[in-house]
C-alpha cells in the first residue's frame, strides 16, 4: 500500500495522526492494521479513558479511508479493535541496575543475564507526532536480573515494560 496518499490526507486534516500504517495477517481475506497514535498520561484515568475513545475513533477513520481509497478494501469491514489501547510507557522501576540504550547497541552480556533481547529499538515521540526513532539491534543483548530487582524493596521482582531501563532500552525490551 502506498502510504504517501495517506500522509497527504493527514496533512489536509482528513485523517488523524497515525504511524505506519503497518499491515499483516495470517488468514485469507483478513488483515490487521497497526496505525493509531494517541498520547496522554496512562497513569491518569481521564487521559486513559480519552485515549480509549480517541483510539477507536481514529481506528474507524483510518478504516473508512482505506475502504474508500485503497484498492482491495472496497468491500471490507472493520472486524474488531484491540480490547484496550496499547500503552508504550508509564512508570519504570528504579532497579539495582538500569539497562541502557548504549548497552543494548553494544550487545552487552551482563554476568547476571536472564534473557536475551534482539528487537529493534523503537521509540515514539511523546508530543503526538507520527514518527518513530527505530534502530535495529545488530546482535542480541542481555537483560540483567538486577534490572528486575528494586533498589529499595526486598522480595519483589518486576517484569515487562516496568523493569529498570532508560527510555531507549525500553523501546526494545517492552
Name the predicted role of every residue range.
Residues 1-159, 163-166:
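Mobile, glycine/GP-rich and aromatic-enriched active-site lid/loop segments adjacent to catalytic centers
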Residues 167-174:
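A conserved FAD-binding loop/helix module that cradles the flavin
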